[in-house]
Amino acid sequence: MVGHLHLQAMGDTREQSRDGLLDSPDSGLPPSPSPSPPFYALSPGTLDTRTTTEAPAAPSLFQTPPALEMRSRLLPVFFGESIEVDPEPAHEIRCNSEITYASERYFRDKIFYAPVPTVTAYSETIVAAPNCTWRSYRSQLTLEPRPRALRFGSTAIIFPKLARSSFRTTLHCSLGQPRHWYSSSLQLRRCGDPTPGPSCPDVL
């Protein structure tokens, strides 16, 4: 009996064995090319680049943190302001009245003073609390009494020895600058009638 036997797997086995014979060192032929891509040698610079591009290592837990920069902040705690008022310098009030006659002179001057409050000092204090918008203000005004002439009176008693027909009175008031002066004049004339009349004053 004559027949044919078909072995499908035999062809593949034969090809594999043929490739194996070609790749074996006993065949005397050079090795077949590898299906893997060719290997190219990397330069040292390329290796360094690849090394540096690797993921950075996780920071150590025991690494000391950088010192925090501490800056002190200046906040207003107390603020004071004072204003000093320099009043006018003290004036010496002198009121002199002088009457000059050809005879004796006699003077009686009266000056009345009264304390008048005058601003002598002024101060203001502002207190600011830190980290707060609260403010405290305090103002102080100092008043001190200073004498001031309110009324001036002068009386002159005359004992004439040599009677004259005209008299003049001058009053000088020195209240600082400028000075003030006042003058008054009195003129007398003889009366034939000894009885007092409207034209003859009985009291000087």
Swiss-Prot record:
Care to name a GO molecular-function term for this sequence? filamin binding
Q: Which GO terms describe its cellular component?
A: actin filament bundle; cytoplasm
Which keywords are on file for this protein? Cytoplasm, Cytoskeleton, Methylation
Q: Which intervals carry biased composition (Pro residues)? A: 28-38
> Which sequence positions carry the modification called Asymmetric dimethylarginine?
R151
Gene knockout outcome: No visible phenotype; probably due to redundancy with RFLNB. RFLNA and RFLNB double mutant mice exhibit severe skeletal malformations, as characterized by scoliosis, kyphosis, intervertebral disks defects, vertebral fusion in the spine and longitudinal bone growth retardation. Chondrocyte maturation is accelerated in double mutant mice.
Keyword Zinc annotated: no
Which GO biological process categories is it annotated with? actin filament bundle organization; negative regulation of bone mineralization involved in bone maturation; negative regulation of chondrocyte development; skeletal system morphogenesis
Where composition is biased (Basic and acidic residues), the residues are 12-21
Localization (cell): Cytoplasm, Cytoskeleton
The record's region (Disordered) falls at: 1-52
InterPro entries, A to Z? Refilin
Q: Which Pfam families match?
A: FAM101
Per the record, the domain of life is Eukaryota
Which signals induce this protein?
Up-regulated during chondrocyte differentiation.
Tissues showing expression: Detected in various tissues, with highest expression in lung, followed by spleen.
**Which family, according to UniProt?**
Belongs to the Refilin family.
What interactions and quaternary structure are annotated? Answer: Interacts with FLNA and FLNB.
Tell me, in a sentence or two, what this protein's role is: Involved in the regulation of the perinuclear actin network and nuclear shape through interaction with filamins. Plays an essential role in the formation of cartilaginous skeletal elements.
The name under which this protein is listed is Refilin-A
Source organism per entry reads: Mus musculus (Mouse)
